[in-house]
Amino acid sequence: MHSFGYRANALLTFAVTILAFICAIASFSDNFSNQNPSAQIQILNINWFQKQPHGNDEVSLTLNITADLQSLFTWNTKQVFAFVAAEYETSKNALNQVSLWDAIIPEKEHAKFWIQISNKYRFIDQGHNLRGKDFNLTLHWHVMPKTGKMFADKIVMSGYRLPNAYR
Amino acid sequence: MGWIGETVDSIKSIQIRQLFTQAISLGMIVTSALIIWKALMCVTGSESPVVVVLSGSMEPGFKRGDILFLHMSKDPVRAGEIVVFNVDGRDIPIVHRVIKVHERENTGEVDVLTKGDNNYGDDRLLYAEGQLWLHRHHIMGRAVGFLPYVGWVTIIMTEKPIIKYILIGALGLLVITSKD
């Protein structure tokens, strides 16, 4: 009952249990953080808008993205993954979500930013429904913790519209 | 030589009833582990409720050796979710993020494109020959939580199976020669 083996086993079990408990509490503490992120997206330019050889519409945009995601960071946050998606509906598809740009924000200091880029991923439709299409631009974020539960949320910005003709 | 004689004596002196008791206790431990695993499968609705990250394609968020807790609900798949999926013909699941979703009006079927955060291009190269989109039946679960470093135990045991055998052998020896 008092051999080295028993003592080592009891110590190890206790240590692992305490570690698991601490991880759970760290994750739980994330529920209490006050979060108020903000963002604005402007479409500066439609670079081109064409129908591809095999029939699908494709558009290239230049976006101006301003965001302040600093309030999302807690002591248990490893990084925040932010991305902008265009969301619209067509007659065939109830919902289309196309990610246009994403970024990994590793620290709170980098979470307040202003960036002007053309879309990182191609905005391609399934079909040719994009002329004159109204769509939303949504900034999504995914808070990845050092340990425990991950949180995700978004801000929806509506009122964007594609031109009526190809250019 | 005397040590060998002692071991042989101790093996000969094992009573059959004691041996059965020990075998049954071991069986109980293994079975309860299995019950917990199956219960987790039921609760999370996923075929494998816990997966180990094997590659660096989701760094710096998930490193090799981290474990992910999965959950699969009837909610529709949306962009930004981290999903675990199996490609037809491959048995190792892949954990990447959804970047494109096209959901059909009537049937609710969905076309999904994924990409690893740390990869340059999307996953079309990883899908089966001629496959452009993932469908719901490929997806095993969404990642909802994560623990760092714990998965290294599984990686070491899979890549160097000799360690697995040594561990099981040592455990077996301990069970046989322990006094209680």
Curated annotation (Swiss-Prot), chain A:
Residues 33-167 are lumenal. Its main location: endoplasmic reticulum. Pfam families: SPC22. The chain crosses the membrane at residues 12-32. Coiled coil: none annotated. Residues 1-11 are cytoplasmic. Essential component of the signal peptidase complex (SPC) which catalyzes the cleavage of N-terminal signal sequences from nascent proteins as they are translocated into the lumen of the endoplasmic reticulum. Essential for the SPC catalytic activity, possibly by stabilizing and positioning the active center of the complex close to the lumenal surface. This is Signal peptidase complex subunit 3B. It comes from Arabidopsis thaliana (Mouse-ear cress).
